[in-house]
Every structure is written in structure tokens, then in C-alpha cells.
């Protein structure tokens, strides 16, 4: 009875090693060295958006992995690159789904490895909480530096307070005009504090 390859059962926990994804009935794993395409990130004046950009390197698909593995076997007969690619393409079109599923499984493993590696190389900086903010960073105005200020904003001290200006405005009395004009005592107060007077003859 021919052996058919099946994907392992999916579980909720994420597998971090190849050994945990294989069992005694799995195909033998062939380790392939992948040249890292990422450059080391040094401390500089770049923005956070540029530092957290993922690498442009993509993991290989199932056919590329099959071609890289089978080309090592075909090149032992001193075949050139064109013959190797043509032979692998003919083989890929004539094999069953179990053969393709195996290399699809390898491509999933490689994509998981690449995602984990890229996330470790480019950690996203966590947002600063209010407990990490200094008192000096919160003040936009000048204050007395000789006075000891708290290092954090926790507690009920050194907090800014805003007071509403509730001072009374002096009400201007309407002027009394002579020479036959009478000014009404009623005034209209607009929001800008400008008084308008109704003059009746």
C-alpha cells in the first residue's frame, strides 16, 4: 500500500520547532540553509515607522523548495541549470497530490520560521504609559527648577488645574440724551460684550 502524506492536525498552540511538527510516520526532513536577507538595525535617528518595516524577503513556495532539493540530486550527473529546471517541471506535473502536499508542508514551515525571525528582528516598540512620563515632559511652560518635583504623574500632587473666569463685568448704564431724544433703559448684551442701545424719538 503506497504511503500518502497528510498534514498534521491543527492545534491551538503555535509550534516553534520542526521536531514538534513531525512524527514517526512523516517524511524525512531535509535541512536547507537560507541566507538571511535582513540587515542589522543600529541605533540611529530613524523614525519608528521605518524601523518596524518588515523585510522584503518572501518565503519560498512548494515548487521552489522542490526544485532546490531535487536539483541537488540531478546535478550529480553534471546537468546544467536549464535541464534541471525542465526536469523538475516535468516531474512536478506528473506526480500525485501527496508529493505536492509534502512540499507545501515544507513551505508552511519555512514561512512560519521567516515570520518569527522577522518579528524578532523588528520588535514593535510598546507605547509609553503615563507612569513613564516625566513631570518635565508634561510641562510646556517654565517652572522653578530649584523646587523638587515628582518624577511621575501619579498621586494627587503637582497637577494642573484650570479655573473658569467668573469675574463680574461692570454693567454700563445707557446714556441719557437731551434735545428731545429719549433712551430706553433696556439694553441688549451680545456674546462679545458690545452694548447696543435702542433710541426712540
UniProtKB/Swiss-Prot annotation:
Keywords: Activator, DNA-binding, Nucleus, Transcription, Transcription regulation. Signal peptide: none annotated. Residues 56-122 bind DNA. One of its GO terms (biological process) is regulation of mating-type specific transcription, DNA-templated. GO terms for cellular component: nucleus. It is found in: Nucleus. GO terms for molecular function: DNA binding; DNA-binding transcription factor activity. The C.albicans mating-type-like (MTL) locus contains, in addition to the genes for the regulatory proteins (MTLA1, MTLA2, MTLALPHA1 and MTLALPHA2), a and alpha idiomorphs of a phosphatidylinositol kinase (PIKA and PIKALPHA), a poly(A) polymerase (PAPA and PAPALPHA) and an oxysterol binding protein-like protein (OBPA and OBPALPHA). Belongs to the MATA2 family. This is Mating-type-like protein A2.
